[in-house]
Amino acid sequence: MAAKDGAKSQEDYKLKDMKPELGERWPHGGQRGGTGWIGSERAASTYDLVEQMFYLYVRVVKAKDLPPNPVTSNCDPYVEVKIGNYKGKTKHFEKRTNPEWNQVFAFSKDKVQSSTVEVFVRDKEMVTRDEYIGKVVFDMREVPTRVPPDSPLAPQWYRLEDRRGESKKRGEVMVAVWLGTQADEAFPDAWHSDASSVQGEGVQSVRSKVYVSPKLWYLRVNVIEAQDVEPSDRSQPPQAFVKVQVGNQILKTKLCPNKTTNPMWNEDLVFVAAEPFEEQFFLTVENKVTPAKDEVMGRLISPLSVFEKRLDHRAVHSKWYNLEKFGFGALEGDKRHELKFSSRIHLRVCLEGGYHVMDESTLYISDVKPTARQLWKSPIGILEVGILSAQGLSPMKTKDGKATTDPYCVAKYGQKWVRTRTIIDSSSPKWNEQYTWEVYDPCTVITLGVFDNCHLGGSEKSNSGAKVDSRIGKVRIRLSTLEADRIYTHSYPLLVLQTKGLKKMGEVQLAVRFTCLSLAHMIYLYGHPLLPKMHYLHPFTVNQLDSLRYQAMSIVAARLSRAEPPLRKENVEYMLDVDSHMWSMRRSKANFFRIVSVFAGLIAMSKWLGDVCYWKNPLTTILFHVLFFILICYPELILPTTFLYMFLIGLWNFRFRPRHPAHMDTKVSWAEAASPDELDEEFDTFPTSKGQDVVKMRYDRLRSVAGRIQMVVGDIATQGERFQALLSWRDPRATCLFVIFCLVAAMILYVTPFKIIALAGGMFWMRHPKFRSKMPSAPSNFFRKLPSKADCML
């Protein structure tokens, strides 16, 4: 029974094929045809990776000549659009008889049961019931159909009618009503009947939006030297260092080794800056008075926009900058710019445009272009993604005592982020939104995450209790694994690791197509570096890259959270894997078994050769002898045979090639085998928030694991040192024996043809077990007795 449950769960974690009805399907006469304005000669739609969803659009533009209220002599008008049980309202204007709203309402046609569309104009009353001004009624059967790229439907003026529709009243309203799809330009900013329960500021947070990451630059500051820097105590020469701050980033040079008023450093400090350059460049030269006290001797403040932009590896001219004496300006007010001190600093500062500023891991990078746009190459393809729907999403919060989920998707590729609209209170939402990206390198990854919206302005309470959008799951797709011009439609499992273990949160359905614009250019890219050339001409250290990536992620998260509606910090951090560098016992085990899997082929080959040598299958061993004789007699066939063999293996494996993109694999991730304590440790904060006993237990476990790794590394070092000891005379007798052996071997190899040597060595290696001894060989015994530096270890 347990085996069946395990097999079932493994099946749930796999990718599933789908066959959705993609493309346009219209209710009146087939695809792209029928009556009305839709002609059969129209070009193919760009929305061919999603299922068609029909909406009734009502655009309320403005009204004129509205009658005032007979009691207040004023008019505070608003418009209410009613279709069946669905109602949408515009905002009201105070004391306006000619208001302008220019608002669009979108009603899902699948949920519309009414045969009429009613547009009411009402007068807002603060105490009593809102006053009726008039209405306009449209017959659903007479509503025209509009499909992009048709021009927008022109709104028209309609006279208001009384309640019964028998007579006209004073006032007119300008309205346009049409039947369209999610491809309509009005769709993203329209009021949706699906989100009619959302009010106030929450309305903005449910709409679909496209975001662009800020343009990031590396700011390189080469601190060369300073002159005439004086501390407050002039009797003691300063031990100076430089501190530079850009935004929230602070870096320091090393202390000048000599105590002098003319210190030298020649040290590089690298920061991340984003356009538009809002932060100031703030530099101070400080004196290390005591280990706990620093004294500012001078400062420099400058906007980032004044620095030179470098696009290649050419040298940047250095400049001398005057330092302002710190503290004098604060005392003298406006005279601070006049009080220049004689000290100055020598800097070489530039904004690096030839690098790609990495805000994500290189393992699943989505953008490889340099910062400077003039260095970009032409795109080699187009990536189109249809975000169709989701199924079986787990409830993420409680609202009014009811478990519910308000899901939306976020997709990130390159500098472009997209966010779908939020589907209110649905565990099986249907988005059917399509997005497009330009592709500059096929060896990149698109990331898509599903979240629960907790910012709808209601009484939601997430399971964690915090007002953050909860993670439902994530999908990554590497573009190089996709066949060109093929549509992949699959249902991807949404898997999340929690402290209690692995949990499937549902499934998300995607349609993906990668279109190649230039096959020759794409093949050409496979032989070129992934990153721009500056990363290889002037590379950063590993520690620098980690720090700069974290700073870039922080800047991107801060900028996108200021958009309207905001793409929140928790979204950006989850998509960019901000915690991927944190220690995890589970990841360590997974990486170890990945290494084992990589060498599994070599291990299997070694085992097979051992079976051949020990004559486990005599026929195989005899055939191997024959092949060995042929290769010895005709050595020029060795390399052609090897490459021909790999060619045939590639052709054979073509039949079994993967038919679908890779997805989150629970076995590779070692997700199901992780213990609860290991998962609890993985999700612990940094620094830890656990109790002393728990930390002690985990520390001891880590020491045990590290001890085993230490033993393996020591054994590898020992074997290498024994090779070095062969000629080092550390063991004089062993080295003497080896030197004599080398001399004899040189003479034998000189007078004996190589084919004879190779044939004799091969026959000895494959000799029959009758001629083998169970004792270790003499060379092995000799090697094991060589000395190593393990004897010198404390």
From Swiss-Prot:
Keyword Nucleotidyltransferase: no
Family annotation (CDD domains): C2B_MCTP_PRT_plant, C2C_MCTP_PRT_plant, C2D_MCTP_PRT_plant
Residues that, per the record, bind Ca(2+) 2: 123, 125, 131
Gene3D superfamilies: C2 domain
Main subcellular location of this protein, as a coarse class: endoplasmic reticulum
Pfam families: C2 (PF00168), PRT_C (PF08372)
Domain called C2: residue spans: 37-158, 198-321, 364-492
Subcellular location: Endoplasmic reticulum membrane; Cell junction, Plasmodesma
Span list, region Disordered: 1-34
InterPro entries, A to Z: C2_dom (IPR000008), C2_domain_sf (IPR035892), C2B_MCTP_PRT_plant (IPR047257), C2C_MCTP_PRT_plant (IPR047258), C2D_MCTP_PRT_plant (IPR047255), MCTP_C (IPR013583), QUIRKY-like (IPR047259)
Induction: Up-regulated by APL/FE. Not regulated by photoperiod, circadian rhythm under long days, vernalization or gibberellin treatment.
Basic and acidic residues bias (residue ranges): 1-27
Coiled coil (UniProt feature): none
Membrane-spanning ranges: 510-532, 595-615, 619-639, 737-757
GO cellular component term of the entry, any: endoplasmic reticulum
Keywords: Calcium, Cell junction, Endoplasmic reticulum, Flowering, Membrane, Metal-binding, Repeat, Transmembrane, Transmembrane helix
Membrane topology: Multi-pass membrane protein
Tissue: Expressed in the vascular tissues of roots, cotyledons and rosette leaves. Specifically located in the phloem including companion cells. Observed in flowers. Not detected in the shoot apical meristem.
Entry keyword Repressor: no
One of the GO biological process terms: positive regulation of long-day photoperiodism, flowering
Gene Ontology MF: a single term: metal ion binding
Cofactor requirement: Ca(2+)
Protein role: Involved in the export of FT from the phloem companion cells to the sieve elements through the plasmodesmata. Regulates flowering time under long days. May function as a signaling molecule by regulating the trafficking of other regulators.
Family: Belongs to the MCTP family.
Subunit field text: Interacts with FT in phloem companion cells.
Protein name: FT-interacting protein 1
Organism of derivation: Arabidopsis thaliana (Mouse-ear cress)
Gene: FTIP1
